[in-house]
From Swiss-Prot:
This is Uncharacterized protein RP289. It comes from Rickettsia prowazekii (strain Madrid E). It is a single-pass membrane protein. GO terms for biological process: protein secretion by the type IV secretion system. InterPro entries: NTF2-like_dom_sf, VirB8, VirB8/PtlE.
Amino acid sequence: MNNIFGFFKSSNNTQSASGGKQNQENIKSANPLKISQNWYEERSDKLIVQRNLLIILIILLTIFMVISTLVIAFVVKSKQFDPFVIQLNSNTGRAAVVEPISSSMLTVDESLTRYFIKKYITARETYNPVDFATIARTTVRLFSTSAVYYNYLGYIRNKDFDPTLKYKEDNTTFLVIKSWSKIADDKYIVRFSVNETSGSQLVYNKIAVVSYDYVPMQLTDSELDINPVGFQVNGYRVDDDNS
């Protein structure tokens, strides 16, 4: 009897042991799936947090860029840029900054001189097919010495610079004075731009050195209407202004 009870007892123990092992195996097989699911959930949460932080950062950077642009635009509009001219002394080699002349410092003679210089540069540097060969050329002639005038004729007769070939009847130009600098009693440095009125509407920035004098002239009545005081340019040089 003892052997019989011992057999059933050992059988029950064997079944219990096998059942326990099976439960442990089921738990072990279930744990990797749960761990994997938890890892994906944590990873997804981290990605969402990172995305939200990135969106906030982009918004802050956009606001900063807008504010910076507005500040720069305000500073540029409120800041005044005045061109300056450096004059070199031919004897000593010393450099000096030439101060531009303000309107409050102008005398009557200087105002008159600036008027005639502007009139001269306008006639010489701008183009209008209506009066280029007549009034403009006559103005340059009456305001120039013979040497300066013939130098002008040689310039405009060059095919590379002749405005009648460049613009023909299709375009005109106008002058805008940017600054005046008086570097001697009879000499000015003038910064200006020549602006096209149509087509590409290009702008050509230039700088001219103009020396002048007032001399007695024998002129006709019609010529006196153009140059009534004997204003004469005895030196003229113009270059592109890249400043």
